[in-house]
Design a protein with these regions (language model features):
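ATP-dependent carboxylate activation and anion-phosphoryl transfer catalytic cores
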Residues: 213-284
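Conserved N-proximal alpha/beta basic substrate-recognition cap immediately N-terminal to
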Residues: 2, 9-111
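Structural motif
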Residues: 51-53, 129, 165
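Conserved anion/nucleotide-ligand pocket segment
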Residues: 124-152
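Rossmann-like NAD(P)H-binding beta-loop-alpha module
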Residues: 101-128
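Glycine-rich phosphate/pyrophosphate-binding beta-alpha loops
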Residues: 56, 138, 197-199, 255-265
C-alpha cells in the first residue's frame, strides 16, 4: 500500500521536502503520493500511512482539519499520531512541557476575550512578542515595544476569538536568530540557523549548523517530556530554541504538526524519516 504525503491546495511557498521524501521512499520500494488533506475524493483507507507535511492552511480551516484528523485516524495510521497532532495544535503545549521540567521561553497564555496585566508584563520583560496560540508560520506574530500597551491590546483585540501567547523578546533572537533542531524517531538529524520572522515576512534560514551540547540536551529532554506525557515518540519533530538572558537555550516552539524539515539542506536526512515511518508500521 502507498504512503500519503499530505499538503494543502495553495502553498504559500513551495515545499522542497516533498520530492526528496518521495525519492527516499522510492529507494525503499515504497510508493509515496502527494495529496491534499481536504480533497473530498481521497480514500484515506487505501494508504498504509498518512504523513502530515505541509498542511499550512489548517489555521484558516481549523474545525475541518480537526475533523480530518479524526476521520483519518479511524481508517489508517497518521504520522505523527493523532494524539500528538491534537496536542500540538495549540501552543499551550509549551506550558505542559514547562510543567514537565523543560526550559521554555517565559510564556503567558491570554485566553480569547481574556485580560492580562500588560503593565506588569512590560515591566517584567521589556519588549514583548505576541503570537496566536494556534498559528502556522509567522501569522499575526508581532513585536511590541516597552510601553506600547495600547498597541498590544489592539493587536489581540483585532484578532478576536483567538487565544494569544505573550513572551519576552529575546535579544539573542534579534541579534543572532534561533536554532532549529530536526529530529527523526526521537534522534537529532540536523539543525539550521534561522533569523527572526514577523508577520508577513519570509522565512530567513541561514543554512546548516552544528547544535551545541546544551541545545542537543534541551531537544532530548523535550522529546523525553513528550513521551512522558503519554504521547509516544514523534516520527518527526523540530525543536526551535534560542539563548535566554543567561545564555542557556530555551525552547521557543516544538513543531510536531507541519514543520519545514529543511531536507533540501541535507537530502540524505530524508532516509531517517522514512525509516521512522516504516519502523513504526513494522512495530504495529
Amino acid at each position: 500500500m502507498p504512503i500519503a504525503l499530505v499538503t494543502c491546495i495553495e502553498l504559500p511557498r513551495p515545499d522542497p521536502d516533498l520530492p526528496i521524501l518521495r525519492e527516499s521512499f522510492a529507494r525503499r520500494g515504497v510508493s509515496a503520493e502527494v495529496v491534499v488533506w481536504n480533497d473530498p475524493t481521497i480514500d484515506w483507507s487505501r494508504f498504509d500511512a498518512v504523513v502530515v507535511r505541509s498542511t499550512w492552511d489548517y489555521v484558516a480551516n481549523l474545525g475541518a482539519f480537526a475533523r480530518w484528523i479524526d476521520e483519518v485516524e479511524r481508517v489508517t495510521r497518521l504520522v505523527n499520531s493523532a494524539p500528538i497532532l491534537r496536542w500540538n495544535l495549540h501552543k499551550r503545549y509549551l506550558l505542559d512541557l514547562s510543567s514537565s521540567g523543560v526550559d521554555i521561553i517565559p510564556t503567558t497564555l491570554v485566553p480569547a476575550g481574556g485580560t492580562v496585566d500588560w503593565a506588569a508584563l512590560f515591566a517584567r520583560h521589556g519588549d514583548l512578542v505576541l503570537k496566536p496560540a494556534i498559528s502556522a508560520g509567522s501569522f499575526a506574530t508581532v513585536r511590541v515595544g516597552r510601553g506600547e500597551e495600547a498597541a498590544a491590546v489592539e493587536h489581540v483585540r483585532s484578532h478576536g476569538g483567538r487565544d494569544f501567547l505573550v513572551q519576552p523578546l529575546l535579544r539573542s533572537v534579534v541579534e543572532h536568530g534561533e536554532t532549529n533542531i530536526v529530529c527523526f524517531g526521537g534522534r537529532p538529524s540536523h539543525a539550521i540557523h534561522k533569523g527572526a520572522r514577523w508577520s508577513g515576512q519570509a522565512e530567513q534560514s541561514r543554512g546548516l549548523v552544528a547544535p551545541t551540547a546544551a541545545e542537543l540536551d534541551l531537544a532530548a529532554r523535550t522529546l523525553a517530556a513528550v513521551e512522558g506525557l503519554g504521547l509516544g515518540v514523534p516520527a518527526y519533530a523540530r525543536v526551535d530554541c534560542a539563548a535566554g538572558p543567561d545564555g542557556r537555550p530555551l525552547l521557543m516552539e516544538l513543531e510536531l504538526l507541519e514543520p519545514a524539515l529543511f531536507l533540501d539542506r541535507l537530502p540524505s536526512a530524508a532516509d531517517a524519516l522514512v525509516a521512522a515511518v516504516l519502523a513504526d508500521h513494522a512495530s504495529e
